[in-house]
Amino acid sequence: MKLIPESSGSHLSGTYLSAALEERHPGSFAFEFEDAVVEFLPADQVQKESMDSLTSVLEKLGAICGVSSSFTNLYDGNHAWFQASAALQNGLSQEDNSIIFYFQDYLLPQLLNSALAGRPSWVYYTEGLKRLKKHDDSSQVSYLHTLRVYLDNNLSVTKTAAALYLHRSTLLDRLSHITAMLGSDLRDPDYCLTLGIILRAELEQRRIEKIYLK
């Protein structure tokens, strides 16, 4: 687990937090690291610790935490640190009111954030996506949004039409234009996966940017 203060105004010393956690969890060890407190718990201790009891402890300590998956090798500690840190980062960026964030709950946001490697989404645009973007820049109808919803609904015309509140014939006409502009076959699963990752990663990138601009 990685623990940080719940707010900048509430801060207990890392030494105190570490001692309190080790007293609460026999067999664990905790220490300060990079302005946070890290705690390693034995697997059986993790299973005993319920969400409610951990929440109670964190509330008393004025802390929030990210929780990694279980590891059996102490040499995997760097992976556990990465997971706990990512859980905190993704959980806080979701504007969730929780104080416990589990890495397993944020796999998709983490994968999407990693997919772009810190670069703007347009860097990864295929030529077809560039054509759709050019269309959208001068139209009230977004082909990119339509394509993303279509991919999210596993190429189901019925579900996509319902999601976009469009008549089926209107959607089919729009998809015909989109497919022509893409210049590739949407029946190719690898191609669809590539487009889906780019468009979902772009959506996630925009969401995070809005949070930081507030």
Q: Where in the sequence are the language-model features?
A:
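Cytosolic nucleotide-utilizing catalytic cores of signal-transduction proteins
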Residues: 1-214
